[in-house]
């Protein structure tokens, strides 16, 4: 259970960071 929770949290964090980076790139590209 702990491993699954950690993996899920890690995956969520990686996805969140990736989305934020892409969003910043898109904004900087637009402006």
UniProtKB/Swiss-Prot annotation:
Skeletal muscle (at protein level). Keywords: Endoplasmic reticulum, Membrane, Sarcoplasmic reticulum, Transmembrane, Transmembrane helix. Residues 27-31 are lumenal. One of its GO terms (biological process) is regulation of cardiac muscle contraction by calcium ion signaling. Residues 1-7 are cytoplasmic. The chain crosses the membrane at residues 8-26. InterPro entries: Sarcolipin. GO terms for molecular function: ATPase binding; enzyme inhibitor activity. Its main location: membrane. It comes from the Eukaryota. Changing residue 27 to A: Nearly abolishes inhibition of ATP2A1-mediated calcium uptake. It is a single-pass membrane protein. It holds the Pfam family Sarcolipin. One of its GO terms (cellular component) is sarcoplasmic reticulum membrane. CDD domains: Sarcolipin. It is found in: Sarcoplasmic reticulum membrane; Endoplasmic reticulum membrane. Changing residue 29 to A: Reduces inhibition of ATP2A1-mediated calcium uptake. Homooligomer. Can also form heterooligomers with other sarcoplasmic/endoplasmic reticulum calcium ATPase (SERCA) regulators ARLN, ERLN, PLN and STRIT1/DWORF. Monomer. Interacts with calcium ATPase ATP2A1/SERCA1. Interacts as a monomer with ATP2A2/SERCA2; the interaction decreases ATP2A2 Ca(2+) affinity. Interacts with VMP1; VMP1 competes with PLN and SLN to prevent them from forming an inhibitory complex with ATP2A2. Reversibly inhibits the activity of ATP2A1/SERCA1 and ATP2A2/SERCA2 in sarcoplasmic reticulum by decreasing the apparent affinity of the ATPase for Ca(2+). Also inhibits the activity of ATP2A3/SERCA3. Modulates calcium re-uptake during muscle relaxation and plays an important role in calcium homeostasis in muscle. Required for muscle-based, non-shivering thermogenesis. Belongs to the sarcolipin family. This is Sarcolipin. The gene is SLN.
């Amino acid at each position: 259970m702990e491993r699954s929770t950690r993996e899920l949290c890690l995956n969520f964090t990686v996805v969140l960071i990736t989305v934020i980076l892409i969003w910043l790139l898109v904004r900087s590209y637009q402006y």
